[in-house]
Amino acid sequence: ATFDIQNKXTYTVWAAAWAPSYPGGXKQLD
């Protein structure tokens, strides 16, 4: 999936905050 570039910053913050919590942390959501 893609996300609006205007939301990228928010997405980046969200990913940085939560991605490490998932199994195999650092996995990115597309």
UniProtKB/Swiss-Prot annotation:
GO terms for biological process: defense response to fungus; killing of cells of another organism. Keywords: Antimicrobial, Fungicide. The keyword Oxidoreductase does not apply. Expressed in the skin and the flesh but not the seed of the fruit. The keyword Ligase does not apply. Has antifungal activity against P.infestans. This is Antifungal protein.
